[in-house]
Regions:
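Membrane-proximal HAMP signal-relay module
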Residues: 1-62, 80-84, 89, 227, ...
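Conserved catalytic submotifs in the C-terminal HATPase_c
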Residues: 26, 30-34, 128-133, 150, ...
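Short alpha-helical segment of the dimerization/phosphotransfer core of two-component systems
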Residues: 102-108
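Conserved micro-motifs of the catalytic ATP-binding
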Residues: 122-127, 165-168
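Short helix-loop "hinge" at the ATP-lid/N-box region of the Bergerat-fold HATPase_c
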Residues: 184-185
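Acidic ATP/Mg2+-coordinating residue in the GHKL
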Residues: 211
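Short conserved segment of the HATPase_c
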Residues: 216-230
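Glycine-rich ATP-binding loops of the HATPase_c
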Residues: 257-263
Length: 280
């Protein structure tokens, strides 16, 4: 009887481990037997639960990837087929080739973003932090988007000022600022404003990037940094883009030792605030 009380729970745990090893992430071991075996079963079950969560996230991630890839591919194929079979008249070919080019670029950015996220979350991207002026990065990003800003008749405010030193990886910070400014340009109406502000607070530098426009619905604010989140429920962030840019921002800011959040007054403005270690 004593042997059965010991071997029974061990056999149960062994069977659960076999099922888990075969890919059944719902496998759990009964928590019974002596204290040591019960503790072991609890530890096993906690591990199995974590693996199940990871597997579910992976499945959702792959489903989102498939959906995001399918959309531009469908558009590209449809327009190319239309040009080949004559549905699209020759005089309109240039226009639709332009759309195909845009969708191809979107596809390339999506693939690059997914590769970036995979490497960042796996800790495979080295951090090369250094002390430098934050405003140089902000200015470089704005200048790189100068044509889009002019086309959108957007007013830029708060750019420049005295040097403000941060200690961070310049590539990380450039990507964060670029992604936020890219969103701001997309959602700022003609004649609207994108403004920049930054100041040192203790051993951190707080950066604020704000744009006028529809803003983000209050119920959407907690989710804007989630992977693949695209705000269908808010007028401030629609389905344009991959839903990966702000998620990448959060990862990069956190890796840099800072934090990021969004603020908004729906119908008026949206502001992204993030912190970075101050340079000495």
């Amino acid at each position: 009887v004593l042997a059965k009380r010991i071997t029974g729970p061990i056999e149960d745990i062994s069977e659960a481990a076999r099922r888990l090893g075969s890919g059944d992430f719902t496998a759990r071991a009964p928590v019974d037997g002596c204290v040591e075996l019960a503790d072991f079963a609890t530890t096993f079950n906690n591990m199995a639960a974590r693996l199940q969560t990871i597997d579910n996230s992976r499945g959702q991630f792959m489903g989102n990837i498939a959906h995001e890839l399918r959309t531009p591919m469908t558009t590209i194929k449809g327009f190319i087929d239309g040009m080949l079979d004559g549905t699209i008249p020759p005089e309109e070919t240039k226009h639709y080739l332009g759309i195909v080019s845009q969708e191809t670029g979107r596809l390339a950015r999506l693939v690059q973003n997914m590769l970036d996220i995979t490497k960042l979350e796996a800790g495979e991207v080295p951090i090369h932090a250094q002390t430098y002026d934050l405003w140089k990065t902000v200015t470089d990003v704005v200048l790189s988007d100068e044509q889009r800003i002019e086309d959108g008749k957007i007013d830029i405010q708060g750019l420049g000022g005295d040097p403000l030193l941060i200690y961070a990886d310049p590539d990380f910070v450039h990507q964060v600022v670029y992604n936020i400014v890219d969103n701001a340009i997309k959602f700022t109406p003609a004649g609207g404003t994108i403004s920049f502000a930054a100041e040192r607070r203790g051993n951190m530098v707080e950066v604020r990037i704000e744009n006028t426009g529809a803003g983000i619905a209050p119920e959407a604010l907690p989710f804007v940094f989630e992977r693949f989140y695209k705000e269908d429920r808010s007028r401030g962030m629609n389905t344009r883009g991959s839903g990966l840019g702000l998620h990448i921002c959060k990862i990069l800011v956190n890796l840099s030792g800072g934090q990021i959040h969004a603020e908004s007054e729906e119908g008026n403005w949206c502001r992204f605030v993030f912190t970075l270690p101050a340079g000495q």
